[in-house]
Structures are given as C-alpha cells and as structure tokens.
From Swiss-Prot:
InterPro entries documented for this protein: CitG (IPR002736), TriPribosyl-deP-CoA_syn_CitG (IPR017551)
UniProt enzyme class: transferase
Name of this protein: Probable 2-(5''-triphosphoribosyl)-3'-dephosphocoenzyme-A synthase
EC number: 2.4.2.52
Keywords linked to the UniProt accession: ATP-binding, Nucleotide-binding, Transferase
Record has DNA-binding as a keyword: no
Keyword Secreted: no
Catalysed reaction equations from the record: 3'-dephospho-CoA + ATP = 2'-(5''-triphospho-alpha-D-ribosyl)-3'-dephospho-CoA + adenine
PANTHER family in UniProt: 2-(5''-TRIPHOSPHORIBOSYL)-3'-DEPHOSPHOCOENZYME-A SYNTHASE (PTHR30201:SF2), TRIPHOSPHORIBOSYL-DEPHOSPHO-COA SYNTHASE (PTHR30201)
Molecular function terms, GO-annotated: ATP binding; triphosphoribosyl-dephospho-CoA synthase activity
Membership in a protein family: Belongs to the CitG/MdcB family.
GO biological-process terms attached to the record: prosthetic group biosynthetic process
Length: 292
C-alpha cells in the first residue's frame, strides 16, 4: 500500500488523528448498512433488491475499506501544495487498490464501490485541510472535494464514443450526472439537505435510527439516483422519488409504527427490482460528516 509517486511532500499529521477519521468512515458505512428497514437495500432484515449480496458482505467490505482510508488522508496531506485539479489523478491508484481489497473481501461482490469514491474524496480533502491548518468542517471538506473534481463531469460523461459506459448512457438519456456530478458540485444534497435535516431531527430528540431513516427518504425523494435509473429507467426513478416524497408529506418516519410504511415500500422496491444505492452512499457521507 505504497503512496503514488505524485505525492509532493511528507505528511506531518499524527497517525492517531488519521486513524480517528478512518474509524469514523468505517462507522458510517456500518451505520448505513445496519440501518433497517431500508427500501430496496441490504439491511438486517433482508437483502433488498439484491440477490448477489448479504449483510455480512458489507461488514467485510467496510473493514477492508477502513484500512485504506488513512491512505486517502495521507495523500490529501502530501499533495496539499498541488493544484486541487491535479489531486484526483493521484487518488485513482489508491481507489483502485482499495476496490481490489473490497472485491477480495466479498468474493467479487460490489458492495461499496461508490463509497470508495466519495469517502476517498472526503478523506483526501480532510488531509489537505489538516496539512494547510485550515478548519475541518462539513462545508470545507465538501468544497475541497469539489475542487478536486472540477471538470470531471465534462471529461467523463460528455464524451461521445461508440461504447458508452452506464454512467454516460444515463447522462445522455436522462441528464443524470450521478456520483461524479454530486462530487463536482460539493455534495449539495448532503450539505444543504440531508445533513441539516438529520441534525435537526437529532436536536429534536428523535431516535437516531428513525432520524437516519427519515433522512434516507429525503435523499431518495430528491436524488437523481443512477442506481435506480439503471435498473428501472426514468419511470422507476420517478416512481421511487414520488413514493419517498409521499411518505415524507405524510409525516415521515417519527415513530416505530411508521416503520410499517418503510416495510411496504421495501416490498414494492424488491418487486420492481429497484435499489437506491446512490442515496445509500450519500447517507454514508451524511453519517460521516455528522461526526466531524
């Protein structure tokens, strides 16, 4: 797990501080997957709309990824004097190596590929901010991550070629920018919506699990989730957004009784083979940023 050659200087950050942030990332991944019931997603109750993965796969995956999060932080610190647009290139080898360990831990199952991208970006942003003695807050972390991704959507989604990736196809057909667009914009769905919503519910004394489930509904209602669109097309995405919005308008998830609505929503997502994995990734970021 050596550092890429594009690092420019040695980090001065304490190992204990780096490991603390990595632990927060691991906790965020575990919190999300253990949260139940989640419509269409793997949780403690069932495997959602997934036939190829189980809860234990996510637990093994999160542990494997935790070991790499310090590398993202260290690279963010070592590259602090580089132009932010140049950082992403150096992060890619770390992300690919982390992805390899994830696949080895899960016997080939893609459990957290989206989170490797998003958590990797945020961890690198934290490393850069710490190295530059700048405040580490949800806003500064996300804006720094955005600076790493400047031009990413243009470079990777608007390219015309005969062999379109799934992301390019969804962008051309539906205008969805997915994880790339959200990162380049500085995670506005998290910073402007999910995180303040979650923290407000906690301040009101709501049970943390209920608060997270309600926040997941908010993300599902507002996120142009490419995971959903790739499975169910535009119709599937719009249906899921409407259902989530309807539950929010009815009062959301405030009591254990409200979980019955989520269980029904889960059954319907499974029947339609829809899994809001993109919203789950954003919920992980919400959990992570709420801790820093």
């Amino acid at each position: 797990m050596s550092m890429p050659a594009t690092s420019t200087k040695t980090t001065k950050l304490a190992t204990s501080l780096i490991d603390e942030y990595a632990l927060l990332g691991w906790r965020a991944m575990l919190t999300e997957v253990n949260l139940s019931p989640k419509p269409g997603l793997v949780d403690r109750i069932n495997c959602g709309a997934h036939k190829d993965m189980a809860l234990e796969d996510f637990h093994r995956s999160a542990l494997a990824i935790q070991g790499w999060l310090p590398r993202f932080i260290e690279f963010g610190a070592c590259s602090a004097e580089m132009a932010p647009e140049a950082v992403l290139h150096g992060l890619r080898p770390i992300g690919m190596a982390c992805e390899g360990d994830m696949f080895r831990a899960t016997a080939g199952v893609n459990t957290h590929k989206g989170s490797i991208f998003s958590l990797g970006l945020l961890c690198a942003a934290i490393g850069r901010l710490l190295q530059l003695n700048q405040p580490v807050t949800p806003t500064t972390v996300c804006s720094t991550a955005a600076s790493f991704c400047r031009g990413l959507t243009d470079r990777e989604l608007r390219t015309n070629n005969s062999r379109l990736t799934a992301g390019q196809r969804l962008y051309q057909q539906l205008g969805l920018t997915g994880a790339r667009g959200e990162a380049e914009a500085g995670y506005p769905l998290v910073i402007n919506h999910a995180l303040p919503h979650y923290l407000t519910l906690l301040d009101q004394g709501l049970d943390p699990e209920l608060a997270l489930l309600d926040t997941l509904l908010l993300l599902m209602a507002t996120n142009g989730d490419t995971n959903v669109a790739s499975r169910g097309g535009e119709g599937g995405l719009r249906w899921l957004q409407r259902e989530a919005q309807t539950l929010l308008q009815k009062g959301g998830i405030r009591t254990p009784t409200d979980l019955d609505y989520l269980r029904q929503f889960d059954r319907e997502c499974i029947e339609r083979n829809l899994s809001p994995g993109g919203s789950a990734d954003l919920l992980i970021l919400t959990c992570f940023l709420a801790q820093i």
